[in-house]
Amino acid sequence: YKPLIGKFCEIPVGPKQYRRLIPIITDEYPDPNFGSGAVKITGAHDFNDYQVAKRSNIPMYSLMDKKGVMRVDGLPYKDEVAKAQAILNEEINWDEDLIASMNLVPDEYRGLDRFEARKKVVTEITAEGLAVMVDATDNEGNLSTKAFVESKPIMQPFGDRSKVVIEPMLTDQWFVETSKIVKPALDAVKNGEIKIIPESGEKTYYHWLNNIEPWCISRQLWWGHQVPVWFDKDGNQYC
């Protein structure tokens, strides 16, 4: 892939005349022995892609809302693409607020459930001849072609209760910069003030604290049970 680094490729969805170009970059994250060795990056909706996007300073465009529906806000797709192209060409400066306000979901996909949108993308890519096709035989023995789909294991989070696929997304949260407060904990073990038993646990301890991530301290879950309380127009409480 070396000759392709620094070039651009087209995202094959949406009206042909408005399709967006994205850069082809290199990173140590992809496994060259897994699949093609090349991956797409969706920084706003994948933990690993987020880190890759940060390292390469790639804008992270959110495509879904909190209900798993493709976004419907923002300008028409052609206008958002023009703005994204200007950002790519370094014609305009950008920050997180600008990127968060932009909706790069093609107009025909807006408002669709995420799974509906996926099926529509596959159908349209296949119809346009952009999918890899393989020979297939139907139940009656007739030979045809179909889009090639590889079955590969991936790490996919599901909700414990809903059993529904969890989609990572960018939200505003409060974090503690833990890298600034771990030094005393590291020094306490290094100088012998704290002894880890068995001693082999020290390696795990050092690896954890030396690679610690910021700690998210804000929550969207309920703390405890909700108590049903009502107030009438006179201020009386009913529980």
State each model region's role.
Residues 21-27:
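Short beta-strand-centered aromatic/proline hotspots
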Residues 16-20:
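Short coil-to-beta-strand transition motifs
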Residues 6, 33-238:
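Residue patterns forming the tRNA-binding/recognition surfaces of aminoacyl-tRNA synthetases
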Residues 13, 28, 64-67:
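Residues at the C-termini of beta-strands that transition into short coil/loop
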